[in-house]
From Swiss-Prot:
Taxonomic lineage of the native organism: Bacteria, Bacillati, Bacillota, Bacilli, Bacillales
Natural source organism: Staphylococcus epidermidis (strain ATCC 35984 / DSM 28319 / BCRC 17069 / CCUG 31568 / BM 3577 / RP62A)
E.C. number: 6.3.4.-
Xref: Pfam families: HIGH_NTase1
Listed GO biological process terms: tRNA modification
Family annotation (InterPro entries): Rossmann-like_a/b/a_fold, tRNA(Met)_cyd_acetate_ligase
Protein name in the entry: tRNA(Met) cytidine acetate ligase
Name of the top EC class for this enzyme: ligase
């Protein structure tokens, strides 16, 4: 069975995602479409607006199999996000990775990916990082290509292509041009497509604009967001005030000395937004700071990080997805494709289980990794 993989967050699922999934199936000429989806926390450095089980149900309107991207991928830089996603795709024997981009020129993006792998080995690259320059800015300077590197989906696509060259050279790639609104557009201003940011804002504000840009057949699944990033503040504050500096230093993604700034600025902040503003510097992007704060919230330490894939958590599937899962189990009997988390399998997903517990504290949800059945359609 030939498969195409989509690396996703679906926060929430919308017409742009449906467009991407539909064209990916058509252009890849594959039998099965697989979504590797972030769980309850997403790459922006915040909790997803709906828990992963609801988002899985949404996704199955367009794909055949949904698996969870390991938490470490979701709360990392684009390169680590891509590395873990591609390794997960390899574990699932995916043939083609399809991603959206502003460029839609696979040749240009692959050329930049190859350039970057070489540039990152140079002493100049590491020196610029030490100077506090952001990763996209350094790459823009080194490659002399501002246009492609100004677009977030291009940058992420390049990270996928780098990871494929390094970890899965047999895998093919396909890119599909994004349609409609810009990635971080805050207002729904298109009759069919909109950014995730604008849809989340519409849902939060209880207006109905989101209905124009979400597939009709799944609109009944949408409701006011389960939680927002602001809900995390009391828990983050507790962690920063009660944890010793040495413990904070061990938190995943914290760079040398940033724990000092965290413990200073928490006493000057009365909300997540104000903490973010107080922590802001030229050296660190807002997204980096938010991911650090989520790792503080979840107490994810450097010792918790494992970039190898030892098992995959299956969240949901269609009949076609079920057939593909049977194919995987028959062809890779030593791999672990987990559809039911229990005492025997929980050790594979310690970070994800903890993230679900914390998400439930934030959102007053009750669906855990142990009591929620596989989503089937």
């Amino acid at each position: 069975m030939k498969s195409v993989g989509l690396i996703t967050e679906y926060n929430p699922f919308h017409n742009g995602h449906l467009f991407h999934a539909t064209l990916s199936k058509q252009r890849s000429e594959t039998n099965v479409t697989i979504a590797i989806m972030s769980g309850n926390f997403v790459m922006r450095g915040e909790p997803a607006i709906y828990h992963k089980f609801k988002r899985t149900e949404m996704a199955l309107s367009a794909v055949d199999l949904v698996v969870e991207l390991p938490l470490i991928g979701s709360l990392s830089s684009s390169d680590t996000f891509a590395e873990i996603a591609i390794k997960t795709a390899q574990y699932l024997d995916i043939d083609i990775i399809s991603f959206g981009s502003e460029s839609a020129s696979l040749k240009d993006l692959q050329y930049l990916a190859t350039q970057m792998i070489d540039y990152e080995k140079h002493p100049d690259f590491k020196e610029k990082l030490k100077q506090g320059k952001s990763y996209p800015r350094i790459l823009s300077e080194l490659t002399h290509n501002d246009t492609l590197l100004q677009s977030p989906n291009n940058i992420l696509g390049i990270s996928y292509l780098k990871a494929m060259q390094q970890f899965a050279p047999h895998m093919s790639a396909l890119t599909i041009k994004r349609e409609g609104s810009l990635h971080h557009q805050k207002v729904i201003d298109h009759h069919h497509f909109a950014s995730g940011t604008s849809i989340r804002r519409s849902l939060m504000n209880d207006n109905v604009d989101w209905k124009n840009v979400v597939p009709n057949q799944i609109q009944s699944l949408y409701c006011k967001p389960h939680t927002t990033v602001e809900d995390t503040f009391p828990f983050i504050k507790h962690q920063l005030i009660t944890q010793p500096k040495e413990s904070l230093h061990s938190i995943y993604t914290i760079n040398e000395g940033f724990e000092n700034r965290l413990q200073t600025m928490i006493h000057r902040s009365d909300s997540f937004e104000s903490l973010l503003s107080n922590l802001n510097t030229k050296r660190y992007t807002q997204t980096y700071i938010q991911r650090v704060l989520m790792n503080v919230l979840l107490n994810i330490t450097k010792d918790d990080v494992n970039k190898e894939i030892n098992a995959v958590r299956v969240l949901g599937m269609s009949e076609k997805g079920r057939s593909y899962l049977k194919y995987l189990k028959a062809n890779y009997p030593n791999r672990h494709y987990i559809t039911n988390v229990n005492q025997k399998t929980a050790h594979y997903f310690k970070n994800e289980i903890k993230a679900t517990h914390v998400y439930n504290l934030l959102s007053n949800q009750s669906q855990t990794d142990f009591n929620t059945p596989l989503v089937r359609i």
